[in-house]
């Protein structure tokens, strides 16, 4: 917060479809001098918000819902007075639906009087690497955080945030998934620059996953730039039971590849994808079926069963205003002739120049 400790209230935040905005910014409203309203695209009204808002209520905020409870739109009224506590405030939420609920609360933990002791009550922690990324960033800003991942408890000590003078922001590695995966589907080699030597991003697991599916992986350094290079020959190995809990965001790209695999794959640990930009499990099952493939939802994931190539057919693919469903459809078009992608412009959320990059790759 500013030096006086308070942001300006009496304002409205429009979140669009951005999950990080709708789940990270509400915590800042705890430090406003008045109510802050939050709204977003109509499609965002379907995205779950309740765990992070429950956490803010446990910290003293008042939440007024203007639609369905636990979802946008809503107004947050911060606590009238800030209590001085020697012990951390204990907050318990079920973050099974998104790691962002935990991250959103951890980010404000050091400014909570006495600090924050955050308990995740769910059985699984989705996208744990994202939470580790949050903790690493807090450590880099002088915030003391203790993470007991086995007990699913995070403790943030109170104190000032000391931002470093410079911060290196890694490229979003999950955006590389459609391009690197293209090498497996179509055969050939794809090289993505500026691949970090180490990372906390779930997308950093992508090369290992692609290798299990039959790709050759290397990391050449050319003119001091480190690349991730993937080579495929058009053959895709199915993965059987495949736990993707840690990296569910790349599930659509992996699903596109696995449509052409040599045996079935059951991607599990990704039930939380039902609460993403769209219900991605339902959308993936629908679109794979649309092109003549075989896929069905599982309670916690998606099963894809390969079919012969002559069963796959040209189709007009729905994208559900979801950037990852658009790139998924483009990947299918590498091997299925006659694929058309509705509203490919939805990729602008994360890759405004996706179409140009895709076409350049295929030249």
Over which residues does each language-model region extend?
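Short, structured segments at the rim of ligand-binding sites
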Residues: 1-363
């Amino acid at each position: 917060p500013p030096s006086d400790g308070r942001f300006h209230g009496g304002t409205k935040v429009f979140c669009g479809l951005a999950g990080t905005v709708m789940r990270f910014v509400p915590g800042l409203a705890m430090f406003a001098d008045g109510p802050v309203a939050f709204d977003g695209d109509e499609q965002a009204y379907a995205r779950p918000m309740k765990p992070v808002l429950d956490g803010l209520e446990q910290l003293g905020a008042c939440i007024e819902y203007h639609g369905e409870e636990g979802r946008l739109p809503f107004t947050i009224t911060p606590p009238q007075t800030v209590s001085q506590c020697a012990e951390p405030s204990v907050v318990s939420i079920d973050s099974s639906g998104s790691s962002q609920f935990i991250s959103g609360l951890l980010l404000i933990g050091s400014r909570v009087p006495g600090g924050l002791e955050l308990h995740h009550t769910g059985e699984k922690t989705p996208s744990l690497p994202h939470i580790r990324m949050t903790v690493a960033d807090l450590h880099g800003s002088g915030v003391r955080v203790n993470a007991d991942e086995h007990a699913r408890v995070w403790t943030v000590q109170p104190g000032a945030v000391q931002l470093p003078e410079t911060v290196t922001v890694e490229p979003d590695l999950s955006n590389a998934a459609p391009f690197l995966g293209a090498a497996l589907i179509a055969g050939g080699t794809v090289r993505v620059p500026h691949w970090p030597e180490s990372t906390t991003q779930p997308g950093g697991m992508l090369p290992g996953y692609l290798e299990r599916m039959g790709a050759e992986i290397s990391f050449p350094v050319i003119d001091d730039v480190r690349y991730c290079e993937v080579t495929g020959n058009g053959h895709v190995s199915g993965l059987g039971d495949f736990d993707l809990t840690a990296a569910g965001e790349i599930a659509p790209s992996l699903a596109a590849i696995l449509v052409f695999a040599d045996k079935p794959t059951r991607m599990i640990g990704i039930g939380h994808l039902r609460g993403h930009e769209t219900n991605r499990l339902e959308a993936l099952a629908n679109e794979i079926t649309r092109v003549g493939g075989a896929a069905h939802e599982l309670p916690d994931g998606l099963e894809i069963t390969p079919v012969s190539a002559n069963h796959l057919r040209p189709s007009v693919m729905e994208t559900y205003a979801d950037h990852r469903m658009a790139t998924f459809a483009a990947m299918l078009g590498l091997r299925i002739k006659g694929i058309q992608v509705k509203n490919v412009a939805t990729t602008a959320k994360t890759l405004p120049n996706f179409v140009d990059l895709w076409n350049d790759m295929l030249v």
